[in-house]
Every structure is written in structure tokens, then in C-alpha cells.
Amino acid sequence: MDKIIKSISTSGSFRAYVLDCTETVRTAQEKHQTLSSSTVALGRTLIANQILAANQKGNSKVTVKVIGDSSFGHIISVADTKGNVKGYIQNTGVDIKKTATGEVLVGPFMGNGHFVVITDYGTGQPYTSTTPLITGEIGEDFAYYLTESEQTPSAVGLNVLLDDEDKVKVAGGFMLQVLPGASDEEISRYEKRIQEMPSISSLLESENHIESLLSAIYGEDDYKRLSEDSLAFYCDCSKERFEAALLTLGTKELQAMKDEDKGVEITCQFCNQTYYFTEEDLEKIINDSIK
């Protein structure tokens, strides 16, 4: 089961989130049938989104949009405070690797663009914040967003590793943030540790990667686990929701769908679930719309 562990240094100067998102990203790959680079790009976005949502309370929802002008197109993800996330990538078929090493490439094919975060607190007035893409690798772009937009110095590591058949092997990451009151000596110590820590890929490949991430972040410093919560890919779409959307089209357009198309098929962008509305379904919707 996927999970996120929240922790804080005993000094109260640093907090860290570590995540195992393997099943989440695996489910996304299966639903969208993404190829290698698209899988990694979408997976990193889902992980970043789960970190941001874990910072919220109540019934808030956080949308992340990674908007590039190159191969991937847009990547859209939505997460809630209960650990659920859904998302999609416009171009599912990007499959580019380094010839010598087989490393899956993401950044060079993201292009120029923006990292957009929309936080919906349920008040009817969502808050939107935008920062430019720095490398297109998503992890670095997320860290830049946290530092520039939320004014919280942060270190981030996110990755998705694939097996020999390009299926998700493991996915996860971490976020480390400096809290008010941290001394210069503490900051220097943590900066040095982050600079010298093994690559996120090697940590994720270790036998117990959650513990490996925590050990790499805190070293010999004491820390306290604050919480452990489950994570999952979950889409809240339903036939009823799409029926409500059809109701907004108007009688004329609905009648055309019924008479000319003999029904309509709608596919959810976030999870690829398809819903079919028969002529009888459309007749009912038309009748409901004129009541």
C-alpha cells in the first residue's frame, strides 16, 4: 500500500515528507497506457501533487498543471487531503531514452512553460500560483515553486523507475523544508547532507526505500514521525456526473445526439473510464432539462 510519512527534526527546525507512490503511478500507467517518458513525467507530477495536498486540511483540493510547449503537452493532476490523486498527460506516447544508458528522458522534452498550482479551499475562490519551469524535470520545478511561491526553502526528490519492460518498478520521493528558527549551522549541515546523499533513484531501489529516504535526510539527527497516511490513485468520476454535464448542453444539442448519433460515449480524461448514454438515457436527460 502506498503511503506518506510526515516527520520533523527534534529541534523543530526541519520537516520532511517521504512517499511510496508505486501503486499510484502503476495504476496511472495502466489506465492511460503511457510509454516510458510519459509514465515518468506523469508519475512525478502525481507525487508532487500528493505532497502539496498533504500540506492542506479539511476538504481542500490541489490541482497541479505542468504546462510545457514541447512533446508532452500538458500534465494535469488533482489531489485531495485524503491521499487520493488522479491525473493525465496529453501525449501518452513519449518514449525517449539515452542510447548508452537507457535512462528515460523527461526534461529535454518538456519545453518552456509553467508549473501551476490551484488550491481550492471549498470557499468558491480557488487560489492560483504560477512559477516558470526551470529544468522540466518536475522535481526541480516543484522545489522552485515551493521556494518562490510559498516562500519555504525546500529540497525535493521525485522519481519513477521502470523495469526492463517499461512497467513501473518503484515510485516515490521526498520533500525537506526549512522551518522558522533554523540556525545557520543546522541549515549548512542539512544542505551538505542533501548534496552528498545518494541519488533518489538508488534510494528508491533499496530494499526499504521509505526508511532509506528518512535516513538519508536526517543522518544522525534525531527526528519524530508525526503521521503515516495511505495514498492511492482514485478518480471520483461517475455516470451521474457526466449526466449533469450533459444537462448543461441544452435541448437542441441533446436532441441531435439522440436522433443523429443514436447515443453518446464520454471518456473521463483523468482515468480513461468510458460511459455510454443510450437514446433512452438522452431522452430522459432531455425531459429533465425542460422540467
Swiss-Prot record:
Protein name stated in the entry: 33 kDa chaperonin
NCBIfam families cross-referenced by the UniProt entry: PRK00114.1
Record flagged with keyword Chaperone: yes
Listed SUPFAM superfamilies: Hsp33 domain, HSP33 redox switch-like
PTM field: Under oxidizing conditions two disulfide bonds are formed involving the reactive cysteines. Under reducing conditions zinc is bound to the reactive cysteines and the protein is inactive.
Molecular function GO labels: protein folding chaperone; unfolded protein binding
Principal subcellular localisation of the protein: cytoplasm
Family: Belongs to the HSP33 family.
Subcellular location: Cytoplasm
CDD domains: Hsp33 (cd00498)
InterPro entries membership: Heat_shock_Hsp33 (IPR000397), Heat_shock_Hsp33_C (IPR016154), Heat_shock_Hsp33_N (IPR016153)
Keyword Disulfide bond (UniProt): yes
Gene Ontology cellular-component annotations: cytoplasm
Disulfide bridge positions per record: 235-237, 268-271
Coiled coil: none
Organism for this UniProt entry: Streptococcus agalactiae serotype Ia (strain ATCC 27591 / A909 / CDC SS700)
Signal peptide: none
Keywords: Chaperone, Cytoplasm, Disulfide bond, Redox-active center, Zinc
Record GO biological process: protein refolding
Pfam families hit by this protein: HSP33
Record's function text: Redox regulated molecular chaperone. Protects both thermally unfolding and oxidatively damaged proteins from irreversible aggregation. Plays an important role in the bacterial defense system toward oxidative stress.
